[in-house]
From Swiss-Prot:
The UniProt record lists the keyword DNA-binding: yes
Protein name from the UniProt record: Crossover junction endodeoxyribonuclease RuvC
InterPro entries cross-referenced by the UniProt entry: RNaseH-like_sf, RNaseH_sf, X-over_junc_endoDNase_Mg_BS, X-over_junc_endoDNase_RuvC
Taxonomic lineage: Bacteria, Pseudomonadati, Pseudomonadota, Gammaproteobacteria, Lysobacterales
GO cellular component: cytoplasm; Holliday junction resolvase complex
Gene this chain is encoded by: ruvC
CDD domains, sorted: RuvC (cd16962)
Family named by the database record: Belongs to the RuvC family.
Gene3D superfamilies in the cross-refs: Ribonuclease H-like superfamily/Ribonuclease H
BP GO terms, sorted: DNA recombination; DNA repair
């Protein structure tokens, strides 16, 4: 059994999604939630909350591997910079615990789950619910984090079948 933590970084909310993968490659939902950062003071305090909160979740759930969404250029350069800082804090929380980090672009995640890189958030959320047998509407950030974890599980399974590492299995990765 392998436990994968998926992270959808954000400066206001960071999505957390945890799944277990059995020896047959089947995914099982363990936990998902948004890590709320608003109301935590100034931006540096939000980063501290992210670093600490994610560290606590890692200690509780003990993932074997971590997958995180790459930064994309959104509405503004300032937003992208804040997102980059949040992503950096999340990666620090992971690597400080000697866990491997795997990175996936939003298009790669959408392609892995829906079959097309231009899928919208509703389609991704729907597929996450189906794949993990979850009922009801999923909180968007947590659903995105579960999608990152599922993507890594698929890439990992392909890598194992091919006898290569995960970076080689997903050719568009850096």
């Amino acid at each position: 059994m392998t436990r994968i933590l998926g992270i959808d970084p954000g400066s206001q909310r960071t999505g957390i999604g945890i799944i277990d993968i059995d020896e047959g490659g089947r995914s099982r939902h363990v936990h998902h939630a948004p890590l709320m950062l608003l109301g935590e003071g100034d931006f540096s305090q939000r980063l501290k909350r992210l670093l600490q909160g994610l560290g606590e979740l890692i200690e509780i759930y003990r993932p074997d591997e971590v997958a995180i969404e790459k930064v994309f250029m959104g509405k503004s350069a300032a937003s992208a910079l804040k997102l980059g800082h949040a992503r950096g804090a999340a990666i620090c929380a992971v690597v400080m615990r000697d866990l491997p980090v795997h990175e996936y672009a939003a298009k790669e995640i959408k392609l892995a789950l829906v079959g097309k890189g231009g899928a919208d958030k509703v389609q991704v959320q729907h597929m996450v619910g189906i794949m993990l047998n979850l009922n009801g509407k999923l909180q968007p950030d947590a659903a995105d984090a579960l999608a990152v974890a599922i993507t890594h599980a698929h890439v990992r399974a392909t890598a194992q079948r091919l006898g290569v590492n995960t970076q080689q299995a997903w050719s568009r990765k850096k």
